[in-house]
Amino acid sequence: MVKVEYSVKKQDYKNRLQQEEEEKIVHQYLANEFYSGGTMFTVTNVDEQIKGNDCFYITDTSGYTIDEKAFVTYINIDIPTVALELSIINRGDKTQDGWFLNGNNTNNSYVFTNIVSATTLDLRSVEDIIETKTFLITKKAIYDYLASMGWNKDKLKAKCKRIWDNPNEPLERTNYDAHNKQDYLKFQRISHVDKQGHVEKSIILKLRRDKLIKHADIVL
């Protein structure tokens, strides 16, 4: 397989349904390359999927209920950060918790996948994927890491409210690394397209992958 010669950031015009198909391809790839050390069950029940449960993974020592996060809008780019969705303003102009803060989600872990090498920018099969950077981390481990920087769920929700209410609210930078020009933690406003093509606004929290991965249970 030959990696395409360039890196491109895919834009929001890419249909969300197409992204979901690519996420399924990534899941198939992970089933072969990442979950091979235990037993994995893919969740097909829609109600469970809505609760953030994409698969169950059982090893000799642990059991994980996993929400998979594959960055399919970035192919052939080694992304140095991981983004957690904190808050959403939906097309009805109503604010709701994002998947990281949503209390209705019952997953206890996340699997983050960055596709750093592929033969195409539009995945059509597992064979298109050459290499990923993937890690499994529990939700508790992320909250513990955030707590070490002074953040908990209530403070994150309060921060999101201030960001929505005030366009000038600072998007905080914690432990800025001047040498690498990266933050350990940073809030960001973004817009994305839902399945029906409507624009939704979100607040995400960006964390450095190299810092977060130190708290992971499994790394590929």
What residue spans do the PLM features occupy?
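Nucleic-acid endonuclease domains
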Residues: 1-52, 60, 64, 70-220
